[in-house]
């Protein structure tokens, strides 16, 4: 923004300190070969409309999520190439994984109606390489597949299940006379600790961290959870494929996020979010030994999300990214700020 440049605020200081070219929309975009739009989905239509007025012929417009194209039906000038590089995690985790010399699994795609010079895929590959995505795996997808699988993963195992399970497991621990601080810490850091095993050996390694008797119990619990949630997961998938889920979300945007803000308020005031600090150390194995239900929920949620996506026609690699592989990175956000960052 011009005002930020004139006042030389913190963003300006950070950018100039790291030798970035600083300028406003009108001065930078007309000369840019690649313009990346990383604004929130609900702002895309207005942002993209303004970008197109300034972008030069044969430039590239980049997305990290294709909601605006697929669900809003946004049309882009035919002389602009439209690509997507979608890391499968929150933006904060993309940066953290890059800083430690790695990256996150990434989907890339070219919008079929906007590949003006047939160079879209090469540009997308280069962009994914620059974020370190190639170190974790880059999969060519499509705008439609990325959006539908992303929404399904978020609404089920990645966000929906983790959030609900955090609240339910906390209440369960309290009813069994556990200290509120201990219960809060076990759940807040338990998801991160337990899902770390998924990175290295999938569900098999996660289950192997349990004793034989606990493993049997977790397996039986997971089967029961899958039976209970199967129809709900299928309904989520049907609503996402049909566009019903997105239309309701867009309507809430128009209502100034009334539903979203109400849900955030309710979550903020739950017992889990308000749980006190606990300064005693919980050993790594203790998270598994006292988190059998959490392990069962993870196993059931991952398998059910994956299976439901496959049944709807989403390819296995994409379903895997959106069910198992992204899960540890989402769990990290709970470890940082409980459910605040996720929401």
Swiss-Prot record:
Positions annotated to bind NADP(+): 1, 11, 41-43, 91
Binding site residues for Mg(2+) 1: 150, 154
Alphabetized InterPro entries for the sequence: 6-PGluconate_DH-like_C_sf, 6PGD_dom2, KARI, KARI_C, KARI_N, KARI_prok, NAD(P)-bd_dom_sf
Recorded metabolic or biological pathway in which this protein acts: Amino-acid biosynthesis; L-isoleucine biosynthesis; L-isoleucine from 2-oxobutanoate: step 2/4; Amino-acid biosynthesis; L-valine biosynthesis; L-valine from pyruvate: step 2/4
Residues that coordinate or bind Mg(2+) 2: 150, 322, 326
Catalytic activity as recorded in UniProt: (2R)-2,3-dihydroxy-3-methylbutanoate + NADP(+) = (2S)-2-acetolactate + NADPH + H(+); (2R,3R)-2,3-dihydroxy-3-methylpentanoate + NADP(+) = (S)-2-ethyl-2-hydroxy-3-oxobutanoate + NADPH + H(+)
Gene Ontology biological process: isoleucine biosynthetic process; L-valine biosynthetic process
Domain KARI C-terminal knotted residues, every copy: 142-286, 287-343
Cofactor: Mg(2+)
Cofactor note: Binds 2 magnesium ions per subunit.
Keywords, ordered alphabetically: Amino-acid biosynthesis, Branched-chain amino acid biosynthesis, Magnesium, Metal-binding, NADP, Oxidoreductase, Repeat
Enzyme Commission (EC) number: 1.1.1.86
One GO location term (cellular component): cytosol
Sequence ranges assigned to domain KARI N-terminal Rossmann in this UniProt record: 1-141
Pfam families noted in UniProt: KARI_C, KARI_N
Highest taxon of the lineage: Bacteria
Active site residues per record: 65
Family to which the UniProt record says this protein belongs: Belongs to the ketol-acid reductoisomerase family.
Name of the protein in question: Ketol-acid reductoisomerase (NADP(+))
The organism of origin for this protein: Buchnera aphidicola subsp. Macrosiphoniella ludovicianae
Gene from which the chain derives: ilvC
């Amino acid at each position: 923004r011009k005002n930020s440049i004139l006042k030389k605020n913190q963003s300006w200081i950070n950018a100039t300190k790291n030798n970035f070219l600083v300028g406003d929309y009108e001065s930078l975009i007309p000369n840019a070969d690649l313009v990346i739009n990383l604004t929130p989905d609900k702002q895309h239509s207005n942002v993209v409309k303004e970008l197109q007025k300034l972008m030069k012929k044969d430039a590239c417009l980049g997305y990290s999520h294709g909601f605006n194209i697929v669900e809003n039906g946004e049309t882009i000038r035919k002389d602009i190439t439209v690509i997507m590089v979608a890391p499968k995690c929150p933006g904060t985790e993309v940066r953290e994984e890059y800083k430690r010399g790695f990256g996150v699994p990434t989907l890339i795609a070219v919008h079929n109606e906007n590949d003006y010079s047939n160079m879209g895929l090469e540009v997308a590959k280069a962009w994914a390489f620059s974020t370190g995505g190639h170190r974790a795996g880059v999969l060519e997808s499509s705008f439609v597949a990325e959006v539908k699988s992303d929404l399904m993963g978020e609404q089920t195992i990645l966000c929906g299940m983790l959030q609900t399970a955090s609240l339910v497991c906390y209440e369960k621990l309290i009813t069994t006379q556990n200290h509120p601080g201990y219960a809060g810490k076990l759940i807040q850091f338990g998801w991160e600790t337990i899902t770390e095993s998924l990175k290295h050996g999938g569900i098999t390694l996660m289950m192997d961290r349990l004793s034989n008797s606990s493993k049997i119990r977790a397996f039986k619990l997971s089967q029961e959870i899958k039976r209970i949630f199967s129809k709900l997961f299928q309904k989520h998938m049907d609503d996402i494929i049909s566009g019903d889920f997105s239309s309701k979300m867009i309507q809430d945007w128009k209502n100034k996020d009334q539903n979203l803000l109400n849900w955030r308020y309710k979550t903020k005031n739950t017992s889990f979010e308000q749980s006190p600090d606990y300064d005693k150390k919980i050993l790594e194995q203790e998270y598994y030994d006292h988190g059998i239900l959490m392990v069962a929920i993870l196993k059931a949620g991952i398998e059910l999300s994956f299976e439901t996506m496959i049944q709807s026609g989403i390819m296995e690699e994409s379903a895997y990214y959106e069910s198992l592989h992204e899960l540890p990175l989402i769990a990290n956000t709970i470890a940082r700020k409980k459910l605040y960052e996720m929401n």
